[in-house]
Swiss-Prot record:
GO terms of molecular function: alkanesulfonate monooxygenase activity
Membrane-crossing segments per the record: none
EC number: 1.14.14.5
Name the record gives this protein: Alkanesulfonate monooxygenase
Gene name of the record: ssuD
Role according to the record: Catalyzes the desulfonation of aliphatic sulfonates.
Length: 391
């Protein structure tokens, strides 16, 4: 397959603060995720030319703000997509945290707005609101939060949030504020997105479904006089051949049992997130029909919440599938793979030359006598570049 010409997009990687390993659904091949390992991934993503990294949020994860503030000084260009949590935070406190971190890391902060879609976890955090009430809180939160970051004094008495003489004394580096990313597939979520955020995110659904969602969100935003950009969250399993990539996908779930799938799907079923419901419907908890669209594999979603699909294939095939998403309006790809350190290298080395992200071109390669030609032969000869396997 010939790699298509692709418009430039942003590609972000992922810091696995909830765990990492070679396989899903088992401790076999598991890996300690400590500060040193997270720093390794961040530095690799920085040097490889990724635009940024997403840090997950929730009780199964290390706190994203603490991790970002610890890791960011070890990188130079990498941006950090960190979550604010309406309903769990005061918008004024969140604004101070945002401005402080943005200043400390030189304007490299991106903000992920997470409303929360698991009622059980929400109650554990003290939030007892219904689905639509949480989006009411999100709207009020973002209005106050954005105004504070933009330098305004805020006085508001809303249904859920009341602020008197709210001010931010020390502004962020980015003006008027760091970009806001947000995902919400329900009517309430789309309504909030159209009014308040900069980039709308979707899970990795088939291109036709993504196109439908993008068109719907774009139309609602245009009715409000606003224009949004769009991103997608996906896993990637890329190898030098399609056969090797599909073998790697099968191997990723080699230890996943039917009991493990049933237990995971039971947890997902209790959630009131429309996006999670759409993810679960793609595979129905069955492992016999996991290729839900050409080269889009739903095996991850058998046991993992949130992002449950992966692009699987050789570099040219994966680049072609990325182009399909670009053609329907996606300009940002938030990616991950298991294990995250190795797969960050694999995707960048195999696919970046085909998709040519602008941000990767800003990286000055480190000079080393072992690259990029590979290991010397017999301590004397350099490998012939013409014989090298080309991505």
């Amino acid at each position: 397959m010939t790699a298509p010409q692709t418009p430039s997009s942003n590609f972000l990687w992922f810091l696995p603060t909830h765990g990492d390993g070679h396989y899903l659904g088992t401790s076999n091949g598991g890996r300690d995720v400590n500060f040193g390992y997270l720093r390794q991934i961040a530095q690799a993503a920085d040097q490889l030319g990724y635009f940024g990294v997403l840090l997950p949020t929730g009780r199964s994860c290390e706190d994203s703000w603490v991790v970002a503030s610890a890791v960011a000084p070890w990188t130079e260009r990498l941006r950090y997509l960190v979550a604010v949590r309406p309903g769990l935070q005061s918008p004024s406190v969140a604004a101070r945290m945002t401005a402080t971190l943005d200043r400390l890391i030189g304007g490299r902060l991106l903000v992920n707005v997470v409303t929360g879609g698991d009622p059980v976890e929400n109650k554990g955090d003290g939030v007892f609101l219904s689905h639509d009430e949480r989006y009411e809180v999100t709207r009020e939160f973002l209005n106050v939060y954005s105004d504070l970051l933009s330098g305004k004094t805020v006085n508001v008495a809303g249904k859920h949030i009341t602020i008197e003489d709210g001010r931010l004394l020390f502004p962020p580096v980015q003006s008027p504020r760091p970009p806001l990313y947000f995902g919400g597939s329900s009517d309430a979520g789309i309504d909030v997105a159209a009014d308040t955020v900069d980039k709308y995110l979707t899970w990795g659904e088939p291109p036709a479904q993504v196109a439908e969602k993008v068109n719907r969100v774009r139309a609602v935003a245009e009715q409000r006089g606003r224009k949004l950009s769009f991103g997608i969250r996906l896993h990637v399993i890329v190898r030098e051949t399609n056969e090797a990539a599909w073998a790697a996908a099968d191997d990723l779930i080699r230890y996943v049992t039917d009991d493990t799938i049933a237990a995971a799907q039971k947890v997902f079923a209790r959630m009131d997130s429309v996006g999670q419901q759409r993810m679960s419907e793609l595979h129905g908890g069955r492992r016999d029909k996991l290729e839900i669209s050409p080269n889009l594999w739903a095996g991850v979603g058998l046991v993992r919440g949130g992002a449950g699909t992966a692009l699987v294939g050789d570099p040219q095939t994966v680049a072609a599938r990325i182009k399909e998403y670009q053609d329907v309006g996606i300009d940002t790809f938030i990616l991950s793979g298991y294990p995250h350190l190795e797969e960050a290298y694999r995707f960048a080395e195999l696919v970046f030359p085909l998709v040519k992200p602008q941000h990767a071109g800003n990286v000055t390669p480190l000079r080393a006598n072992t690259g990029p030609f590979g290991e010397t032969i017999a301590n004397e000869h350099l490998p012939n570049a013409k014989q090298a396997v080309k991505p």
